[in-house]
């Protein structure tokens, strides 16, 4: 990301694969669920490929070992209860922020603009995970996949966040690692920023107009560096 960004009044972030690497704990919960159900475990890389649409969808995918199929409703219910019970108690055993996450958030906070979380993870789990990682105080709003009637790739969470903050969605950045983040941002009229260190393949996503982010970064501090010219102009 090498050009100044102007008129930004808020920055929204995805959580898993953007601020932190949570796959080890998500995969451990999947393994515990499968073991309890008498099923074979899946490699962590497979679980990683299923992340991004909320835990309900993740459980379907893990149980069927397929991105698009849904498990039998009775099996899914047992699996979901098992998964949630384990995951709630093991949110941050292995989950850690990416190396420059906290530095990037601190720099952005110094600009005086609000930071928000827009994730498809359940809101209560997202809030607790941020607390356990020591990141909760950076954010003025947390929206989870169950906070509103629709979640990403719907633009509703982004538009709702902008409304709560009292700004135009066009003045908010959406930072994420997946197609859901980019599609939601485009539909809401936000500038989309893709990260190269998450679970999504930015090279692949950039090949399609519908999933090509407006900017791509390799570390969160790059956002601050490109907002600095805006701050300097505002202070003149």
UniProtKB/Swiss-Prot annotation:
This is Phosphoglycolate phosphatase. Belongs to the HAD-like hydrolase superfamily. CbbY/CbbZ/Gph/YieH family. GO terms for cellular component: cytosol. The lineage of its organism: Bacteria, Pseudomonadati, Pseudomonadota, Betaproteobacteria, Neisseriales. It holds the Pfam family Hydrolase. It is an enzyme of class 3 (hydrolase). The keyword ATP-binding does not apply. One of its GO terms (molecular function) is phosphoglycolate phosphatase activity. It catalyses: 2-phosphoglycolate + H2O = glycolate + phosphate. The keyword Hydrolase applies. Specifically catalyzes the dephosphorylation of 2-phosphoglycolate. Is involved in the dissimilation of the intracellular 2-phosphoglycolate formed during the DNA repair of 3'-phosphoglycolate ends, a major class of DNA lesions induced by oxidative stress. Pathway: Organic acid metabolism; glycolate biosynthesis; glycolate from 2-phosphoglycolate: step 1/1. It comes from Neisseria gonorrhoeae (strain ATCC 700825 / FA 1090). Its EC number is 3.1.3.18. It comes from the Bacteria. Keywords: Carbohydrate metabolism, Hydrolase, Magnesium, Metal-binding. The active site is at 14 (nucleophile). GO terms for biological process: carbohydrate metabolic process; DNA repair; glycolate biosynthetic process. Its cofactor is Mg(2+). InterPro entries: HAD-like_hydrolase_sf, HAD-like_sf, HAD-SF_hydro_IA, HAD_sf, PGP-like_dom2, PGPase_prok. Mg(2+) binds at residues 14, 16, 177.
């Amino acid at each position: 990301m090498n050009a100044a960004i102007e008129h930004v009044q808020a920055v929204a972030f995805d959580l898993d694969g953007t601020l932190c690497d949570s796959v080890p704990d998500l995969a451990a919960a999947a393994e515990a669920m499968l073991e309890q159900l008498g099923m074979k475990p899946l490699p962590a890389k497979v679980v990683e490929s299923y992340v991004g649409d909320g835990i309900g969808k993740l459980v379907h995918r893990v149980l069927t070992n397929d991105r698009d199929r849904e498990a039998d409703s009775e099996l899914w219910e047992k699996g979901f209860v098992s998964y949630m019970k384990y995951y709630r108690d093991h949110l941050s055993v292995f989950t850690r922020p990416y190396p420059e996450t906290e530095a990037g958030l601190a720099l952005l906070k110094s600009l005086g603009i609000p930071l928000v979380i827009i994730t498809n993870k359940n809101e209560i789990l997202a809030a607790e995970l941020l607390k356990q990682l020591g990141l909760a105080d950076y954010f003025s709003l947390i929206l989870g996949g169950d906070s509103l009637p629709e979640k990403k790739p719907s633009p509703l969470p982004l538009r709702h966040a902008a409304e709560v903050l009292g700004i135009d969605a066009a003045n908010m950045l959406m930072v994420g690692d997946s197609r859901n983040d980019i599609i939601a941002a485009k539909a809401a009229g936000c500038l989309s920023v893709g990260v190269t260190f998450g679970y999504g393949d930015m090279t692949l996503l950039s090949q399609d107009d519908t999933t090509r982010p407006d900017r791509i970064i390799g570390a969160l501090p790059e956002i601050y560096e490109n907002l600095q010219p805006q701050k300097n102009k505002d202070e003149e």
